[in-house]
A protein has these predicted regions:
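Conserved beta-strand scaffold positions in the cores of enzyme catalytic domains, especially
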Residues: 6-8, 55-57, 255, 276-279
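A short loop-to-beta-strand scaffold at the N-terminal edge of the catalytic core in hydrolase folds
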Residues: 12-20
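Active-site helix-initiating loop/hinge in glycosyltransferases
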Residues: 33, 76, 289-290
Length: 306
C-alpha cells in the first residue's frame, strides 16, 4: 500500500513523526487512538487528498518514532493537546479540521475545549464527548467495574500489562484488531486482554491483512507499549487539571459510532449542539472496518462545511 513517507517535526516540547500528503491550504489533522498508529488512516488519506485537503497525520507522543518521555505526567491532556497546537504552528496554520478515533477522539474533544480557536471542525469516531465527571473517573471505574477493568489495571499496576503485551506484540494486536467483536450481544472480550491466549473463540473476525498487521507490529516492537499506556495513567490528573474548563463544543461536528462497538453511545446534544451523528454496522475500528462508508460520510460532511 502506498502510504506517505514520514518526517520528524520538532515542536516546542516534543518531536513527532508526521505523515503528510496533499497540497497546502486546507489542513485536516488525523489523530489515531490506542493501540494504533498513523497507518490507521491509510484508507482515508488518499480520498481526502483527492478532495483537496492537506492531510497531516502524526504519530502522537509515545507512538512510532515520536518522543517517548519517561514521566507519566508528560502524557496528560495538556501535553497531548499542546502537541497538536504546536503542530499547527509548525505548519503555519491558525486552525484545522481535526479527526480523531478512540483516544484520538478524546484528545480532539479536549483540544476544542482548551484551544477552541485552533479547531475549525471535528469529526470523531467511536468515543463521544463526555462532560467532566464529578469525581475521579479511575476511582469510579474501580468501584463499579473492579480491579481487572483495563483502565484500573493500567493505573494500579503500571508496567504489568505492558510487559505481557510486549512479549508477543502480534498476538496482542491480533486479539485487539478484530471486526464486529460485539455483533452477538453475548460476546465479550477477555477481561485481561493483555494476557496470552490462543485466541480461539474470540468474538469477531481478524480485521487486518498480513502486510497491514506487519506495519503495526513493527511500530510497537520499536516503541513498546509503556508510553501509550501512560495516556490512561493520566485520567485522574486530567480530571484534576480541567475543573474550570467550560464543557461545550461549539464547532461543527461529525460523530460516527460503530453499532457493534463496546464504547457506549451517549446523547451529546446538550454539549455538542452541532453534532451530526451516524452509526455504521461495524465494531470499534470504524475507519478500518468500514473505510468506504466512513469516507462517504466524511466527504459529505466536509462538503457541507464549504
Amino acid at each position: 500500500m502506498n502510504f506517505p513517507t514520514s518526517r520528524m517535526v520538532h515542536l516546542r516540547n516534543a518531536t513527532l513523526e508526521v505523515f503528510e500528503a496533499g497540497k497546502r491550504g486546507r489542513p485536516i489533522v488525523l489523530c489515531h487512538g490506542w493501540p494504533e498508529h498513523a497507518f490507521s488512516y491509510r484508507h482515508q488519506i488518499p480520498v481526502l487528498v483527492d478532495a483537496g485537503y492537506h492531510c497531516i497525520v502524526p504519530n502522537q507522543r509515545g507512538y512510532g518514532a515520536s518522543s517517548r518521555p519517561a514521566a507519566v505526567a508528560e502524557y496528560d491532556i495538556h501535553a497531548l493537546t499542546g502537541d497538536l497546537v504546536a503542530l499547527l504552528d509548525a505548519f503555519d496554520y491558525e486552525d484545522a479540521i481535526f479527526v480523531g478515533h478512540d483516544w484520538g477522539a478524546i484528545v480532539v474533544w479536549n483540544l476544542a475545549l482548551l484551544h477552541p480557536g485552533r479547531v475549525k471542525a471535528i469529526a470523531n469516531l467511536s468515543v463521544p464527548f463526555r462532560a467532566r465527571e464529578k469525581s475521579d473517573p479511575v476511582a469510579f471505574w474501580e468501584e463499579q467495574l473492579g480491579d481487572d477493568f483495563y483502565i484500573v489495571h493500567f493505573n494500579r499496576k503500571p508496567g504489568v500489562a505492558e510487559e505481557l503485551m510486549e512479549a508477543d506484540v502480534e498476538g496482542f494486536l491480533t486479539r485487539m484488531y478484530r471486526t464486529e467483536q460485539w455483533l452477538d450481544s453475548q460476546s465479550t472480550m477477555p477481561t485481561k486482554f493483555w494476557e496470552p491466549t490462543d485466541n480461539a473463540g474470540l468474538p469477531g473476525r481478524p480485521m487486518l491483512k498480513a502486510d497491514e498487521m506487519a506495519v503495526f507490529v513493527k511500530a510497537f516492537e520499536r516503541s513498546g507499549l509503556l508510553s501509550p499506556c501512560h495516556w490512561y495513567r493520566n485520567f485522574t490528573r486530567n480530571w484534576e487539571r480541567t475543573g474550570g474548563v467550560r464543557q461545550a463544543i461549539s464547532q461543527p461536528t461529525l460523530m460516527i459510532y460503530g453499532e457493534y462497538d463496546s464504547v457506549p453511545q451517549v446523547d451529546m446534544t446538550r454539549f455538542v449542539p452541532q453534532a451530526d451523528i451516524h452509526i455504521l454496522g461495524c465494531g470499534h475500528w470504524i475507519q478500518q472496518e468500514r473505510p468506504v462508508e466512513t469516507n462517504q460520510l466524511l466527504l459529505a460532511w466536509l462538503g457541507a462545511l464549504d
